[in-house]
Design a protein with these regions (language model features):
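Histidine-acidic metal/acid-base catalytic patches
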Residues: 1-21, 139, 153-263
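N-terminal/domain-start segments enriched in small and hydrophobic, helix-friendly residues
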Residues: 127-153
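Active-site-proximal loop/turn and secondary-structure-junction residues that shape catalytic pockets
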Residues: 29-31, 65-67, 101-105, 150-152, ...
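Hydrophobic faces of well-ordered beta-strands that scaffold small-molecule active sites
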Residues: 25-27, 58-63, 97-99, 144-146, ...
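Active-site groove signature of glycoside hydrolases
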Residues: 89-115, 140-149
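N-terminal pre-domain/capping segments
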Residues: 1-94, 117-121, 131, 138, ...
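Active-site cleft segment of glycoside hydrolase catalytic domains centered on the general acid/base Glu
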Residues: 107-130, 136
C-alpha cells in the first residue's frame, strides 16, 4: 500500500520477492500510486523491466470493484476500472486480472448494498458485468479471475454457480484459500479448483489468527488433482497481530509450499 507509512516501494517489493526465492509476483493494482487510475506506460515498463532483470515473472494483477451494489453508476465505474487494468495487464505481461464478486464497501454486506435484492438477481448483475469484461479481456489475451472474498462468495458451490452463469472461457476462478467460510474449506477449494486460473494461498484456511495453518500438501494435491499447472501465489495478512513479521511469514510459507510441491 503506497499510502502506508511502513510500506515498501514497488522496487523494494520486487527485490524482496527475488531475494526470498519466489518465481513470480502478483502486481496488484493498488500497489501502484496512481490507483485506481492506470499507471503511465513509463511506470508500467519500468516495473516490467525490473522484474525481468530480477528473473521474476508477473503472475497477475488485481483491482477492487463493485458488482453487488444497486448503484448502477458504481457498477459501471467498476467495469471500466476492470477494462482499464486489463490494458495494464497486457503491457505488464500479466495473464490474469483479479476481480471481486464481493462488496468492497465495509462494513456493509452484499445484502445491504444491493438494496435487499435476491441472491439470484445479484448473481445476474455480477454475471452480466463479468461476461462483458471477460469478452473485453479475451480480445486482449487476458483472463478475468474471480476471487472469493467471504461476502457474496462464501462457498465453493457459490463460486462455481457464478462462473457457470457468466459462462465465458476467459472468466475463471481465483481460489482464495482463506475465504471460504465453511467448516472444511478444503472441500470448497476442491470444488472451485477445476475452474482456477490463479490462487491466493493464505496462512490459514479459516481467515483468523490462532487457527490451524494451511496444509500446503493438501493445497498442492487439490491443485494437481484439478489439473492446475499455474502459479500458487502466497498472501499473508496481519489479522490484528501486533508481532506480525511480513517478510518472515512469507518466507515460512514459501518454504512449506515449495517442500509440498517437491514431494
Amino acid at each position: 500500500d503506497p499510502k502506508h507509512p511502513k510500506a515498501m516501494t514497488l522496487s523494494q517489493l520486487l527485490n524482496f520477492t527475488a531475494e526470498a526465492g519466489f518465481d513470480a509476483i502478483d502486481l496488484t493494482g493498488y500497489f501502484f500510486a496512481s490507483y485506481p487510475k492506470a499507471p503511465t506506460d513509463a511506470e508500467i515498463f519500468a516495473i516490467k523491466h525490473e522484474a525481468f532483470r530480477l528473473g521474476l515473472e508477473i503472475s497477475g494483477s488485481g483491482v477492487k470493484n463493485e458488482v453487488t451494489t444497486a448503484d448502477q453508476a458504481l457498477r459501471v465505474e467498476g467495469k471500466q476500472r476492470i477494462k482499464d487494468w486489463v490494458e495494464v495487464c497486457v503491457k505488464l505481461g500479466a495473464p490474469v486480472l483479479r476481480v471481486f464478486a464481493d462488496t468492497n464497501i465495509p462494513p456493509h454486506k452484499w445484502q445491504v448494498v444491493s438494496g435487499g435484492a435476491s441472491r439470484d438477481v445479484v448473481e445476474g448483475w455480477i454475471a452480466d458485468d463479468f461476461r462483458e469484461c471477460a469478452e473485453f479481456a479475451a480480445a486482449r489475451g487476458i483472463f478475468i479471475g474471480v476471487q472469493n472474498h467471504g461476502d457474496f462468495l462464501t462457498t465453493g458451490a457459490e463460486h462455481v454457480s457464478l462462473l457457470k452463469r457468466v459462462n465465458h472461457p476467459n472468466c475463471r476462478a481465483i481460489v482464495d484459500t482463506g475465504k471460504y467460510l465453511t467448516d472444511d474449506p478444503y472441500v470448497d477449494m476442491a470444488l472451485a479448483a477445476p475452474d482456477a486460473v490463479n490462487w491466493q494461498v493464505k496462512e490459514t484456511p479459516f481467515g483468523k489468527p490462532n487457527k490451524p495453518l494451511t496444509d500446503m500438501r493438501k493445497i498442492v494435491k487439490i491443485a494437481r488433482d484439478a489439473g492446475y499447472n499455474g502459479y500458487l501465489p502466497i498472501e499473508s495478512l496481519p489479522m490484528g497481530r501486533k508481532d506480525y513479521d511480513t517478510p518472515g511469514e512469507l518466507r515460512r510459507m514459501l518454504k512449506e509450499l515449495k517442500a509440498a510441491i517437491a514431494e
